[in-house]
């Protein structure tokens, strides 16, 4: 009897609230009301008045509201503001109540945008709160404009931050300064545990303060947080310093900015333990390699150049270059800016005018010393070389604030030119001191190595339409060579050009690192100095552990491009005629430029990819049907694990016998022929042959034929696949964009009913001519839904008039 008594007690409490609310409403009605042009409105219902009163006093009544019976609570939920509605979610679920419809209505009324049709919203509360956080942060929504958003007892940012899984920073880094401000410290701490994806869109030039705020934000969210993915979109003219800052922070490198306070979390983590020589390798984790000499020196340079008003003296030309073998080849191939030369920077004692040290420290070991170039007879050690910024300015200049910060970032990048591959020591010309191998950094006035730290890094990096200059490409390549935590890399329309050779070099070095986790690479661009198949071979050789490779080149390669110095070809270690070693590819997607492709090159990749499960060829053209048949024969012999095969925008009108070979001999689960002109020639003869092959194929589960001008006759012929004498297990059929009319679809539905095969899965009917007879189309779809799940649309078939004329 305890539960009914509690229920009655809560009901009585609610009645008391109702009575008080009624008296308050009656007293207000007794007061003279203002005249209204629309006339007096109907008085609200008693229950609604009670709900409003409860909602207005939730600060006092919250615990009582949570204990209300389900039917009463269900009527109060739509009257609560978003803060209490979010807080009561768990209680509502326990009582069997859902708030999803309320959150959806709030989205429609307040956000006033419609989600993408491709987006499947599983939780409208999380979606609303995430969008609400972004709008409040950017100042695009006024919380005081709607009582459902305004409550003095709650902070909009703090309350919604725990629902944020994806944050977008736009334009001039709006929101970064607000998030790192002290009043929002708890907001940032919550974001550090909830945020997984950080996106940058349409970035513009930003000031020093904004970049410093971004530095602190990235340090908190990536190094001490849970962010695992960073994506950059649509940045036509990247600001070098900002771009390099985002990349280096994403890779786990951290140096406090000039004048910034020490990181509280870093202090807590390092409190109570003494720094050691292996500090860098400990921060990398057990699976990450220790930083090499060039990287440590670059990080040390970043720490020492935070001095204001430090003048540089005019630089002399270097007597020897700091080179890496593969990088030097790349520079020879890709060329360098004629205005950019290698200049040695002034060391700290040269820049400040102080006296240099009287002696240089000894090398770390005899074996290390023996690999170095002979030291100069001059007793004074020469400064470390680096690239000069492409500003066109020479001579002394004052470095202050952002200038020093920008120089530090460039120092970090271009020291990479001195890194030797395969673990070899660096040749520093006449600098014989052991600074670069970490033996004594003080010989160049650098701090101890412990001043530079590397923290947690992201696992997914995406660059969409972000042109990469030579400096930016060098930055990316250097970071990639030791970025062992990276699992997925997407480079889309970045204008790499000849920098693709540097990228391949860095990926090859990364693949050799212990614990390398890169398993997915998505690469697309307008042009490539290598033909797409040679580029694919080079990538597969460089990354034998890759699981997913998606590559697209829109325009043909030009080997005789005058931009390549002396018409030099690619390095011999990047392309070659030797056999491709066995790899771990499971998914391969290729988008080809116009022009016939050499089938043997594609076959060589397929032969080395015995684990391939999914293959997609887009716009591929072969010299003859025999070449296409050679590819299919290779798939049959070497790719026994292949489950999904897709062809898009390929002219297969002359490859009908090869298509029949595919259907009869490959044990696939899904085949896609998208806009392949499959039935353009001999449809009356080819369709029955194709249907017969499919009826005997018991492994095929999905067939996609969009854009092949199937028509009513072809659809009715295809219906025979589901006849009683068929052994086909087809359960997914896509016949979108196939000039199908309502009467043909109705007859197709009747045949399926006649054979009584039962539900066979999904049927897609997008962009067909079903609007020519709406009644017949509805009847056909009604009959089909008894057999399968139908997905269609209300497409205007007049848009396909040109296609109709071409089939007459």
UniProtKB/Swiss-Prot annotation:
Keywords: Leucine-rich repeat, Phosphoprotein, Repeat, Ubl conjugation pathway. LRR repeats lie at residues 483-503, 514-526, 527-551, 609-631, 632-655, 697-724, 727-748. Residues 383-397 have a biased composition (Basic residues). Residues 357-379 have a biased composition (Low complexity). Residues 269-289, 304-404 are annotated as: Disordered. Pathway: Protein modification; protein ubiquitination. The Elongin BC complex binding domain is also known as BC-box with the consensus [APST]-L-x(3)-C-x(3)-[AILV]. Part of an E3 ubiquitin-protein ligase complex with Elongin BC (ELOB and ELOC), RBX1 and CUL5. Component of a probable ECS(LRRC41) complex which contains CUL5, RNF7/RBX2, Elongin BC and LRRC41. Interacts with CUL5, RNF7, ELOB and ELOC. Probable substrate recognition component of an ECS (Elongin BC-CUL2/5-SOCS-box protein) E3 ubiquitin ligase complex which mediates the ubiquitination and subsequent proteasomal degradation of target proteins. This is Leucine-rich repeat-containing protein 41. The gene is Lrrc41.
């Amino acid at each position: 009897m305890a539960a009914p008594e509690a229920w009655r007690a809560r009901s009585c409490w609610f009645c008391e609230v109702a009575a008080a609310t009624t008296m308050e409403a009656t007293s207000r009605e007794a007061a003279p009301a203002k005249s209204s042009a629309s006339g007096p409105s109907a008085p609200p219902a008693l229950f609604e008045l009670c709900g409003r009163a409860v909602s207005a006093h939730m600060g006092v009544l919250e615990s009582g509201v949570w204990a209300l019976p389900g039917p009463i609570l269900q009527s109060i939920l739509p009257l609560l503001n978003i803060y209490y509605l979010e807080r009561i979610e768990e209680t509502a679920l326990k009582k069997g109540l859902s708030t999803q419809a309320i959150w959806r209505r709030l989205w429609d009324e307040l956000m006033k945008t419609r989600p993408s049709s491709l987006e499947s919203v599983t939780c409208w509360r999380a979606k609303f709160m995430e969008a609400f956080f972004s709008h409040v942060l950017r100042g695009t929504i006024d919380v005081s404009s709607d009582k459902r958003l305004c409550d003095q007892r709650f902070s909009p940012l703090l309350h919604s931050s725990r629902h944020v899984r994806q944050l977008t920073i736009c334009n001039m880094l709006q929101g970064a300064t607000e998030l790192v401000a002290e009043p929002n410290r708890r907001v940032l701490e919550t974001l550090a545990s909830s945020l997984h994806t950080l996106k940058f869109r349409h970035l513009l030039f930003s000031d020093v303060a904004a970049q410093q705020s971004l530095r602190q934000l990235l340090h908190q969210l990536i190094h001490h947080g849970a962010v695992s993915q960073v994506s950059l979109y649509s940045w036509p003219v990247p600001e070098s310093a900002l771009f390099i800052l985002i990349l280096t922070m994403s890779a786990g490198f951290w140096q406090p900015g000039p004048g910034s306070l020490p990181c509280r979390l870093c202090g807590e983590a390092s409190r109570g333990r003494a720094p050691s020589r292996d500090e860098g390798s400990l921060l990398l984790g057990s699976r990450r390699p220790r930083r090499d000499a060039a990287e440590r020196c670059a990080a040390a340079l970043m720490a020492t150049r935070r001095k204001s008003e430090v003048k540089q003296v005019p630089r002399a030309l270097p007597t020897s270059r700091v080179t890496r073998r593969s990088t030097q080849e790349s520079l020879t191939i890709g060329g360098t800016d004629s205005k950019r030369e290698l200049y040695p920077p002034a060391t700290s004692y040269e820049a400040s005018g102080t006296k240099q040290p009287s002696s240089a420290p000894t090398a770390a070991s005899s074996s290390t010393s023996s690999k170095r170039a002979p030291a100069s007879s001059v007793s004074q050690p020469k400064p470390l070389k680096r690239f000069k910024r492409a500003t066109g300015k020479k001579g002394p200049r004052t470095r202050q604030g952002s200038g020093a910060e920008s120089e530090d970032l460039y120092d970090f990048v271009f020291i990479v030119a001195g890194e030797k591959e395969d673990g070899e020591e660096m040749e520093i010309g006449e600098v014989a001191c052991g600074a670069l191998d970490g033996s004594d950094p003080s010989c160049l006035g650098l701090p101890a190595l412990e001043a530079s730290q590397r923290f947690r890094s992201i696992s997914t990096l995406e660059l969409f339409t972000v042109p990469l200059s030579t400096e930016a490409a060098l930055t990316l390549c250097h970071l990639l060579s030791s970025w062992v935590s990276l699992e997925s890399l997407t480079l889309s329309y970045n204008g790499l050009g000849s920098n693709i050779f540097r990228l391949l070099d860095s990926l090859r070095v990364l693949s050799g690192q212990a614990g390398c986790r890169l398993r997915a690479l998505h690469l697309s661009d307008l042009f490539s100095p290598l033909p797409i198949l040679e580029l694919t071979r080079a990538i597969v050789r460089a990354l034998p552990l890759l699981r997913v490779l998606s590559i697209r080149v829109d325009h043909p390669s030009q080997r005789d491009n005058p931009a390549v110095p002396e018409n030099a070809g690619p390095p011999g270690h990047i392309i070659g005629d030797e056999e491709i070693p066995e790899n771990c590819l499971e998914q391969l997607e290729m988008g080809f430029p116009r022009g016939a492709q050499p089938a043997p090159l594609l076959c060589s990749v397929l032969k080395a990819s015995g684990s391939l499960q999914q293959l997609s060829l887009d716009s591929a053209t072969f010299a003859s049907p025999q070449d296409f048949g050679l590819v299919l024969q290779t798939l049959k012999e070497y790719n026994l694990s292949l489950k999904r095969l897709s062809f898009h925008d390929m002219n297969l009108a002359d490859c009908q016998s090869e298509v029949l070979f595919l259907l009869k001999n490959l044990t696939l689960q899904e085949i896609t022929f998208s806009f392949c002109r499959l039935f353009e020639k001999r449809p009356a003869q080819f369709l029955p042959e194709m249907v017969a092959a499919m009826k005997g194929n018991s492994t095929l589960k999905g067939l996609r034929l969009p854009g092949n001008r199937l028509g009513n006759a072809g659809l009715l012929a295809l219906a025979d696949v589901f006849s009683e004498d068929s052994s086909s297990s087809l359960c997914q059929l896509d016949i979108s964009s196939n000039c199908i009319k309502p009467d043909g679809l109705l007859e197709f539905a009747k045949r399926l009913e006649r054979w009584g095969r039962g539900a066979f899965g999904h049927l897609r009917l997008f962009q067909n001519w079903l609007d020519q007879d709406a009644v017949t189309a509805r009847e056909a779809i009604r009959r089909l839904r008894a057999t399968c799940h139908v997905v269609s649309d209300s497409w205007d078939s007049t848009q396909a008039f040109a296609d109709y004329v071409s089939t007459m």
